[in-house]
Regions:
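Sec-dependent N-terminal signal peptides
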Residues: 2-11
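Feature for soluble, non-membrane regions of globular proteins
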Residues: 12-205
């Protein structure tokens, strides 16, 4: 298991919550403590609990969450595994005071190559996140050839299903932003850029 991608702990028949590298109120005002308490403490905990109830006795017992998402058909196991994977990547990509405003190194070079500039990338990514109908996720991923892709994933899906490696994900389920932004999804998406820990995202390459 890639520990940089999968920091939730897996033991026999048990999936556990990832440990946040910041306090529940540390991302304010972008994400409030109340949202973290509910989104991380309630929603993600429910997905983890559900997965621990669903997997034992199935062909997915002993598999990592990433392996389950890549192989499972649509259904309860896939939905909960997808949301555990998605939220693990999501919550661990943030920092209260990121060390830089945009990626550098290999990821920064790839963004300029594939999107022209970081600003062009942000515009395309924002359009995907804001334009996704209903609940789901916007992702930046990389394929086996090193090319970057922006994808929209409905509900609990994840780019690993298409053989891609997810690097950066924005949650646009209403539960991720409604307490702070109500129906203003675009404001939520724009604000998230201020707390992205590009050091973490770069290591996922």
């Amino acid at each position: 298991m890639n520990t940089l991608l999968m920091s939730l702990i897996f033991t026999t028949m048990t999936y556990e919550m990832p440990k946040l590298p910041y306090a529940n109120n540390a991302l304010e005002p972008v994400i409030s403590q109340q949202t973290i308490d509910f989104h991380y403490g309630k929603h993600l905990q429910t997905y983890v609990n559900n997965l621990n109830s669903l997997v034992p006795g199935t062909e997915y017992e002993g598999k990592t969450v990433e392996e389950i998402v890549a192989a499972a058909p649509d259904g309860a196991i896939f939905n909960n595994a997808g949301q555990v994977l998605n939220h693990n990547l999501y919550f661990l990509q943030f920092a209260p005071k990121p060390s830089k405003k945009e990626p550098a190194g290999k990821l920064g070079e790839a963004i300029k190559r594939d999107f022209g500039s970081f600003e062009n990338f942000k515009k395309e990514f924002n359009a995907a996140a804001v334009g996704l109908f209903g609940s789901g996720w916007a992702w930046l991923s990389v394929d086996k050839n090193g090319k970057l892709h922006i994808t929209k994933e409905g509900n609990g899906s994840n780019p690993v299903r298409a053989g891609l490696k997810p690097l950066l994900g924005f949650d646009v389920w209403e539960h991720s932003y409604y307490l702070d932004y109500q129906n203003r999804r675009a404001d939520h998406v724009n604000a998230l850029w201020n707390i992205i820990d590009w050091d973490v995202v770069e290591k996922r390459m």
